[in-house]
Amino acid sequence: MARDEVRRILPADIKREVVVKDEKAETNPKWGFPPEKRPIEMHIQFGIINLDKPPGPTSHEVVAWVKRILNLNKAGHGGTLDPKVSGVLPVALERATRVVQALLPAGKEYVALMHLHGDVPEDKILAVMREFQGEIIQRPPLRSAVKRRLRTRKVYYIDVLEIEGRDVLFRVGVEAGTYIRSLIHHIGLALGVGAHMAELRRTRSGPFKEDETLVTLHDLVDYYHFWKEDGVEEYFRKAIQPMEKAVEHLPKVWIRDSAVAAVTHGADLAVPGVVKLHKGIKKGDLVAIMTLKDELVALGKAMMTTGEMLQKSKGIAVDVDKVFMPRDWYPKLWKEKE
């Protein structure tokens, strides 16, 4: 049976168009710190590492090691990997720690080795695995960190890479919170022979991939040493991505300089502050609020659609949830009440 070519597309791969509301708006170069111009100490404070987790330790242990290696106060990871699982583990640092929330809607990709408990013709394996694309129902495993309630999850694609006897190597793109071990168990049941997961590696977490940004713990130790002991920051800088990388896939609203400080001081984003935005924003969407220099200001929930933000002259456009930008990067440009 011929293997169909599978389109490997996650939600993070969706291309979005930008529409401009105010073409005359400009940004003052004296204010803010664009990602590419941040001093190394600031780059760390607002950074995220695309870490290659080794098999063995828990995700929590790996994050603790990163904190110790880099002498940090805070760090958090995006999407727990079981101890035996290796691969892409985004680790957000210091003031960027909460940005991992943005990775939830982005989708994840794994390469898995499934071992069947009986012989099955190749064409049947391919046909049955294809049936698992789309919405599936799962119950988290016994040792899961969440309550064991039935829930639906999306499988965006399954691409069989190799079949050798009872071993099936495949690549799978899934919604966050999908259990690959459970998926393999159900594929085995559907094939009538049973199956278990022999090996698993995460190859993507939204915008974070197995590419030149992926670093190991050994790399981190070396690069940190080069910077601290030898004054060479180039490698260490490349090992840390700006927090803006973690929101690449989100719908965005860009705001004028005069609105930035208000948002960093706790105000929701009002329509007059909007300069441009992505098409297709729906009410309730998680959106990233950006400056005109492409700095992340905050994450929030859209209170209007793209069309409403373009048409209206007042009202709340985004209900701000998490603010990342410090209050002193842009000046207060509103008048205090007497």
From Swiss-Prot:
Reaction(s) this enzyme catalyzes, per UniProt: uridine(55) in tRNA = pseudouridine(55) in tRNA
Positions annotated as active site in the UniProt record: D82
InterPro entries, alphabetized: Dyskerin-like (IPR012960), PsdUridine_synth_cat_dom_sf (IPR020103), PsdUridine_synth_N (IPR002501), PUA (IPR002478), PUA-like_sf (IPR015947), PUA_sf (IPR036974), tRNA_PsdUridine_synth_B_fam (IPR004802), TruB_arch (IPR026326)
Function: Could be responsible for synthesis of pseudouridine from uracil-55 in the psi GC loop of transfer RNAs.
Family: Belongs to the pseudouridine synthase TruB family. Type 2 subfamily.
Name of the protein described by the UniProt record: Probable tRNA pseudouridine synthase B
UniProt-listed Enzyme Commission number(s): 5.4.99.25
Organism: Thermococcus kodakarensis (strain ATCC BAA-918 / JCM 12380 / KOD1)
Pfam families: DKCLD, PUA, TruB_C_2, TruB_N
Lineage: superkingdom: Archaea
Gene Ontology MF term list: pseudouridine synthase activity; RNA binding; tRNA pseudouridine(55) synthase activity
GO BP annotations, alphabetical order: box H/ACA sno(s)RNA 3'-end processing; mRNA pseudouridine synthesis; rRNA pseudouridine synthesis; snRNA pseudouridine synthesis; tRNA pseudouridine synthesis
UniProt entry keywords in alphabetical sequence: Isomerase, tRNA processing
Residue ranges constituting the PUA domain according to the UniProt record: 250-325
Gene field: truB
